[in-house]
Amino acid sequence: MAERKASVERDTLETQIKASINLDGTGKARFNIGVPFLEHMLDQIARHGLIDLDIECKGDLHIDDHHTVEDVGITLGQAFAQAIGDKKGIRRYGHAYVPLDEALSRVVIDFSGRPGLQMHVPYTRATVGGFDVDLFQEFFQGFVNHALVSLHIDNLRGTNTHHQIETVFKAFGRALRMAVELDERMAGQMPSTKGVL
């Protein structure tokens, strides 16, 4: 089996990012981004998706976190698109429900080749530890646009904003793990009647 790894660099006037992933990893993670709450959530993707992630970013944090959070999502999406290759033999679809105390979220993903995001998270607070939670919409939109996936995110219940977000990222990691998993019964075939994704 060919290694499903990728390394991507993205340089703009706002951010300089290096991201490496291994879809068949063990959940190892290393981050140097400068946004602790984002790093905490990315760790959930690695751990629950069993995807090795290594991301470094120098961003214009003196302005705010917006460019950094969005551009990390973009770069991670680019890395996924590279690592997954032609998509032959993958399950393609993934889904997960994840609870954390009072919070429950559902994430469903399709590596369809068509970007689309439906995100419904009724945050109970605007910030967590000074982090603007609205920025996660920008993160996921950046990911979706560059990984070329259809992504549905629903927080079904929750009163603690940290818990709401953490269940989203844990479910996202688990849905990714399911979708990119190689299906032996597919025998390397394209998971689409069109023959292309």
UniProtKB/Swiss-Prot annotation:
Top-rank taxon: Bacteria
Pathway(s) per entry: Amino-acid biosynthesis; L-histidine biosynthesis; L-histidine from 5-phospho-alpha-D-ribose 1-diphosphate: step 6/9
A Pfam family it matches: IGPD
MF-aspect GO terms: imidazoleglycerol-phosphate dehydratase activity
Protein's UniProt name: Imidazoleglycerol-phosphate dehydratase
Family: Belongs to the imidazoleglycerol-phosphate dehydratase family.
Subcellular locations according to the entry: Cytoplasm
